[in-house]
Every structure is written in structure tokens, then in C-alpha cells.
Amino acid sequence: HNTKRGNMRFLLLIVSFFVFAQLTSAQTVNPDYDSTLAKKLGADDYGMKSYVFVILKTGSNTTTDKAFIDSCFSGHMANIVRLVNEGKLIVAGPLGKNDNTYRGIFIFNVNTIEEARKLVETDPAVNSKLLEADLYNWYGSAALPEYLETALKIGKYKIN
């Protein structure tokens, strides 16, 4: 009986050693690692960070008042530009037609859903219930905000 227990402990020790060895060998140091850039972007050891991902969907307001709708969506676009300029919004764009009434996405460069919710509430299309927002914590590359500099240079027409 004690021999079985001793053999199990030995087996567990051997398995633990191999699991630990595998985990530590899987973490190869990146020779291109730039600690200054990683710190500037808020990256963790894997080059990742937390964001808030938002799915915008058709809201409960079914008005057909074109002037009202145009005004709200003009404000929606102006709000997007403002949030991008403040460094809070790093991805925004419409989705193609779909059966889920999903209209677009946002990715906010903030850590909490509460922070993102306050930013979403500044959107006239959301406030008027033309759009509704579902917010999710998302873990992605800390380099994501870096694409904005290039994105602003490749569009022939300015979004305003």
C-alpha cells in the first residue's frame, strides 16, 4: 500500500517536472522586444492589453423622421472623430447587412466597461435610441492604437 502511494508521488513529481519544463521552455524571449514602446502602449509581457469592444445594433427608436435621423447620425460621426482625437476610440466602423441587426463596432482604449459606457452615452445616435450598444471586455494587441496614424493618411476623403 505504501509502495503504491510512493510510486504515485514519484509519478506526480515526474509529470510536474515535465509540465513545468514545457511551460518555461514555451516562453522564449522576443529579441525585438522594445520595453520603452511596450510601456508607452501599456503592454503586458505578451504585448497585449485590455480594451472594451462594443457592438452597435439597431435601437428601439423606429422614427422615420429623416431630418432627425440625419442629425443624430451627423452627431454620431462628429462624436467618433472627437473620441478618436482624444485617444479613447481606436476602431470604429459599420458592419455589413446581417440578421442580428448589428450595425457597427467600436473598440475603446479604456480599461473598464464603465468608462466605455460613459463614452458611448456621448453619442447622439445612442442617446436617441437609434442605436443600442453591447459592451464587452476584450484582450488584444497593445499595438492596436498605432495603426491610427497610418489610417489617417490613407483615406482620400476626410471623415468629419
Which functions belong to the PLM regions below?
Residues 27-160:
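Conserved, structured core segments of small domains
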